[in-house]
Amino acid sequence: MSGIRVCIDTNVFLNVLNRESVFYQDSKEVLNAVDLGTLEAVIPTLVIAEILTGFYTDNKDDKAEQFLSTIISNKNIEVVQLSIEIAASSAVIRAKTGMRLPDAMVMSTALHEKVDYMVTNDRNFPDSFQGLRSIKSAELAKLL
């Protein structure tokens, strides 16, 4: 499985951070596989902003800094900033699919980075878009 590149949606991180029983174990396996280098992860800056917002809303600034430090220091994670190309593609995806703009931005980033899978537990993501397959953390965990 080495060399598999995935784009990870916000909810996969939140499943682990919030210990959400339905998705916790499989999402944790996916994130552990990134830590071990079994998977290479692409993380849009939007995902980081969404996660940090939760920490700051709950006045957990120390947890926010810890999360950010972990993301930045992980050599198996590539953080991708929103570019003009990704923004324009996001608008097209939103217009064609009706996805919420943040989801379209994550999908656009995944397409731009030519990842193998878009990992999300969001049932509103299309199963496939422009050749990119969306996969649930449970399905990916079985492949690891």
What feature does the model see in each segment?
Residues 1-43, 56-66, 140-144:
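Short, well-structured N-terminal submotif of metal-dependent ribonuclease cores
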Residues 14-16, 50-53, 89-90:
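A short acidic, helix-capping loop that chelates divalent metal ions and anchors anionic groups
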Residues 78-117, 121:
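Active-site neighborhoods of divalent-metal-dependent phosphate/nucleic-acid chemistry enzymes
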Residues 1-5, 107, 112-144:
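Acidic, PIN/NYN-like endoribonuclease modules and their adjacent C-terminal/linker elements
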Residues 46, 50-52, 56-78:
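Active-site-proximal, substrate-binding regions of enzyme catalytic domains
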Residues 12, 47-48, 86, 105-106, ...:
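Alpha-helix capping/helix-boundary segments
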Residues 39, 77, 132:
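Short, conserved active-site loop motifs that form the nucleotide-linked donor/cofactor pocket
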